[in-house]
Amino acid sequence: MSQQVIIFDTTLRDGEQALQASLSAKEKLQIALALERMGVDVMEVGFPVSSPGDFESVQTIARTIKNSRVCALARCVEKDIDVAAQALKVADAFRIHTFIATSPMHIATKLRSTLDEVIERAVYMVKRARNYTDDVEFSCEDAGRTPVDDLARVVEAAINAGARTINIPDTVGYTMPFEFAGIISGLYERVPNIDKAIISVHTHDDLGIAVGNSLAAVHAGARQVEGAMNGIGERAGNCALEEVIMAIKVRKDIMNVHTNINHHEIWRTSQTVSQICNMPIPANKAIVGSGAFAHSSGIHQDGVLKNRENYEIMTPESIGLNQIQLNLTSRSGRAAVKHRMEEMGYKDTDYNMDHLYDAFLKLADKKGQVFDYDLEALAFINKQQEEPEHFRLDYFSVQSGSSDIATASVKLACGEEIKAEAANGNGPVDAIYQAINRITGYDVELVKYDLNAKGQGKDALGQVDIVVNHHGRRFHGVGLATDIVESSAKAMMHVLNNIWRAAEVEKELQRKAQNKENNKETV
């Protein structure tokens, strides 16, 4: 009977470090809910001590997620562990993940310490975390460059202190698969109490072998794999979880292990992460790239038509990628739209039906026929923008010609007030942005502008993703329409509402802090 490999997702912690703009608490919760649907066993959702915003988002996710174990990261520092526990305590059960460097280089140059002192600190902090939960994970940072005898000493001590999961990270993506498997095997040979903990691995893709290292480690006895959807993460990224999951499924004949992942949710979860994080998936990306199941060679096409298994080791349907259907028009009722969403795997809580149907009718009037990918794009955008808006685009028009100079007129609802402005710009999009900025008074610098087609043909939806810099912080916005200028305007409105909401959250946190201080003074 095969053993289970636990899937530990760190998209919202390690993965987020690769993003140009931080995710809002609402965006993080959307990703967490998608990961829960996919069935990840553990999700690491943040580093609570790093900022009040991260604390709030970890707390929100811990309060909401019920079917996956929620985890937060903490250094081997008392305050880190205490704050992580404070954020997580709203969950029925939770994990604290604490770590310290173990390689000679890190101990000497970063920690300016000794191995004995590192072991003493690790033991103390694991015991401290155990005061809050019996689910404690300990990581040996830079384990890939730690002599295995030193590593064995640290691991044995951490297990004795109460760690139930021991993570062995290849922090800088340096180790070769056969080396990494040797490290795992070496620990099983050297650590007498290793049967009291689950051995986990966390690999990085600096040399392009993160997935290979994780699979080699599983073959050597590791029973938890850490990674991120689409492989996002610091530098070259993390181990791509969808690749590990499907490799274990497809090659169960030699791996002799399994996961409890609902693999039919892989494609949808991948798309959710890509869209929210504003990180397009390369066409040739394994498993979830748009070309992963495409066959252009005549020989291959002929072979696939005769028997798909000639050139396909898995099916698109196995990851939840179904054929595009073409069955909705402006005459389709709410029930038909809802039924199609259900067929694609969406639940009522995944979207607002009123908002979705209104957007569907407007799009159907323009396009005639609405495809599945149109519906999914509309559902995503409406979910992103369903919170109350302080700024709302009421009207815009643009005049431009062969000259570079364009003129835009814009009318916005700002709270209860309607304001209008006009401005010139270097092209229609710049002109609209200049007019919007005049109305709001926000000083924003556009640092990234991406346009992607959602669908096919001349009536395809255009999705605009932008990143702006505002007072040292970066904010992401997304807009969707059949018109590129309208998409661009909607993306800027999304950004401005995100900035406004962030300011409101900051005010609320300051108010709570002030109330706490006032209560202390009263006592």
Curated annotation (Swiss-Prot):
Its EC number is 2.3.3.13. Pathway: Amino-acid biosynthesis; L-leucine biosynthesis; L-leucine from 3-methyl-2-oxobutanoate: step 1/4. GO terms for molecular function: 2-isopropylmalate synthase activity; acetyl-CoA C-acetyltransferase activity; manganese ion binding. One of its GO terms (cellular component) is cytosol. InterPro entries: 2-IPM_HCS-like, 2-isopropylmalate_synth_dimer, AIPM/Hcit_synth_CS, Aldolase_TIM, LeuA/HCS_post-cat, LeuA_allosteric_dom_sf, LeuA_bact_synth, PYR_CT. Mn(2+) binds at D14, H202, H204, N238. It is found in: Cytoplasm. Belongs to the alpha-IPM synthase/homocitrate synthase family. LeuA type 1 subfamily. Catalyzes the condensation of the acetyl group of acetyl-CoA with 3-methyl-2-oxobutanoate (2-ketoisovalerate) to form 3-carboxy-3-hydroxy-4-methylpentanoate (2-isopropylmalate). This is 2-isopropylmalate synthase. It comes from Salmonella paratyphi A (strain AKU_12601).
